A protein has these predicted regions:
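Nucleotide-sugar donor-binding/catalytic module of glycosyltransferases
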Residues: 1-242
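C-terminal subregions of glycosyltransferases and related glycan-biosynthesis enzymes
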Residues: 120, 222-400
């Protein structure tokens, strides 16, 4: 049996996807596979590349259907085709180290009940997605061990950290989930692996609720890439954010809407943010499945204020404040509106100009390193972190 399936859902980003596939194919060994779920308008580029240029039996293509699928449906069919004992999902402009298979095997020996593995991720902007100076970052921590599901639940469901994004890296997106856990999730939640239009954060919710043992590594095994065509690129431009949301809404069908009266914040306004998108997903899950939201109202008000701090211009700041204020005024009859008190706008002194180590991450100016893809950046970043072979063999590194 294949030990790890890497699912690669993609839509209309064939050039990036082909580079990602080529990088994964460089890894040796028959114990992993890659399932490419193509949801593109033109099926030819990926079909031709996989059949005639790559011709690697470890890579399987699911061609586009008769009509465009919502993202959640494309993810669903990718998992339905997975054969691996463990499953991971990455984006078509990301990278994951296939040697993760050996790490999984080691964790299965060290932690008998493990059914979910998470790790810190490197982040990287493709060369075409740098409208302003950008920093890539490399987590430099070395610890590994069990994660408390109670603590993770507080961070994700109640937003206990009061930051613009919960620091929860658990889930099938840039994580590895045992097949048995995914089947348990499917049985518990309506006979599907995924329901919500934001399947990555939905997966985090469900894994935290259903996992028996989550092991977290501070050492990264993957790269979150952001190309110019990605949803992640929207974080660098409010205009792009609005365009991405409009396209997403247009192509999303199904019973679950991104707008809900129970949490009346709109993602269609100019001030929408990743922060709000995550909150829409986590609040939906908690309200749908009866998970406690005690403390969420006040905590999210602080998280929203933190999001407003990350504004490059006065216009961006005002749009975010207006978006959040409108939602807080309507939510629970304005119960939490008094807690949303954003500080006045302060323009950033510099934008991604300073490299160095902070918060256990090495920040590097991307214009200076020459890496053209996430895979190349991963190989660059490995010079600053524990060697993979040492982790696999359990040998000590960086000893005093």
């Amino acid at each position: 049996m294949v030990h790890l399936t890497i699912c690669l859902p993609t839509r209309n980003r064939q050039a990036y996807c082909i580079k990602t596939i080529a990088a994964l194919a460089e890894a040796e060994g028959p114990d992993f596979e890659v399932v490419v779920a193509d949801n593109s308008d033109d099926p030819a580029p990926l079909a031709d590349y996989l059949a005639n240029q790559l011709a690697d039996p470890r890579f399987r293509l699911i061609p586009p259907g008769d009509s465009v699928l919502p993202m959640v449906a494309n993810w669903e069919r990718a998992l339905e085709h997975a054969r691996g004992r463990w499953i991971a999902v990455i984006g078509d402009d990301d990278y994951i180290d296939p040697r993760l298979v050996a790490i999984i095997r080691r964790y299965e020996v060290l932690y008998r009940d493990v059914d979910a593995i998470s790790w810190e991720c490197m982040s990287y902007n493709w060369p075409d997605n740098r409208p302003v100076p950008t920093l890539a970052n490399i987590p430099v921590g070395q610890g590994t061990g069990p994660n408390s599901t109670e603590a993770l639940a507080n961070q994700l469901f109640r937003w206990s950290e009061r930051k613009r994004r919960p620091s929860v890296g658990v889930g099938i997106y840039h994580g590895a989930i045992k097949r048995s856990l995914m089947e348990r999730i499917k049985e518990a939640y309506g006979g599907r692996y995924f329901e919500h239009p934001n399947p990555d954060w939905e997966s985090s919710c469900k894994v935290i609720m259903q996992a028996r043992l989550i092991i977290h590594s501070q050492r990264p095994f993957s790269v979150l890439g952001a190309c110019a065509a990605s949803n992640s690129a929207a974080t660098l431009s409010p205009k792009v954010m609005k365009q991405r949301i409009e396209t997403f809404e247009k192509e999303t069908t199904g019973p679950i809407s991104l707008y809900r009266p129970e949490f009346p914040f709109s993602l269609k306004t100019g001030g929408a943010s990743i922060c709000l998108s995550i909150a829409v997903t986590t609040s939906w899950f908690c309200q749908t499945y009866g998970v406690s939201l005690d403390g969420f109202g006040v905590n999210f008000a602080h998280a929203a204020m933190d999001e407003c701090v990350f504004s490059a211009t006065q216009d961006e700041y005002e749009a975010k404040v207006a978006c959040f204020q409108s939602g807080f005024d309507q939510w629970d009859d304005g119960r939490w509106a008094g807690h949303f008190k954003p500080a006045p706008f302060k323009p950033p002194r510099t934008i991604n100009q300073i490299s160095g180590v902070g918060d256990d991450r090495l920040n590097v100016r991307e214009a200076d390193i020459g890496a053209a893809t996430p895979a190349e950046f991963y190989r660059f970043g490995e010079h600053a972190i524990a060697p993979m072979d040492s982790l696999i063999n359990g040998t000590q590194v960086f000893a005093l």
